[in-house]
Design a protein with these regions (language model features):
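Class I S-adenosyl-L-methionine
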Residues: 1-100, 107-108, 130
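Beta-strand/loop-alpha-helix module characteristic of Rossmann-like adenine-cofactor folds
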Residues: 2, 7, 107-156
């Protein structure tokens, strides 16, 4: 059985990693995440670390994962909030998953403007069609928090 340690991180260049996470990372061999995640955490990785970029098509990434019994994955914010942990659970249902979440960007926004997070309708356009956003607008949802990507931005 494969084990995935999925660590949620922020976009901050100065990452706060708990002692438990730093210890896990120092003992790790195989790491994965997006290019941006690698830029943010490379200084914490062991010198002989193997890095697997998370890129599309994901089948290629998961083929590389098959070679390793333990993988430490860095993901944005809360890995279960429209995140990569959901993909791992869907593609590898028998894998053991240990999560270390942090705040996601919409939680950070809500905290900054003192908005109770549960009052916000949240949706993701990351790699998804516009349908959910269109539906929220048609329903007249008052507060909509939207996760975007490089293709679906507030300007598009």
């Amino acid at each position: 059985m494969q084990t995935f340690y999925i660590i949620g991180i922020s976009d901050n260049r100065n990452q706060f990693l708990s002692p438990e996470i730093r210890n896990l990372v120092s003992q790790g061999k195989v790491f994965s995440g997006g290019k941006r995640h690698h830029e943010l955490v490379h200084a914490y990785l062991p010198e002989d670390a193997v890095w697997i970029d998370i890129t599309v098509p994901l089948d290629t990434v998961f083929s590389r994962y098959e070679e390793h019994p333990e993988i430490i994955v860095f993901a944005s914010g809360d890995p279960l909030f429209f995140g990569f942990a959901n993909t791992v659970m869907r593609k590898l249902p028998s894998a053991k998953i240990i999560l270390f979440p942090t705040f996601n960007s919409l939680q950070m926004l809500a905290h900054r403007i003192l908005l109770p997070y549960q009052e916000m309708q949240t949706l993701s356009l990351t790699g998804r069609p516009w349908d959910a956003f269109d539906s929220a607008l048609i329903r007249g949802d008052k507060l909509i928090g939207v996760l975007t990507d490089r293709e679906k931005t507030p300007a598009t």
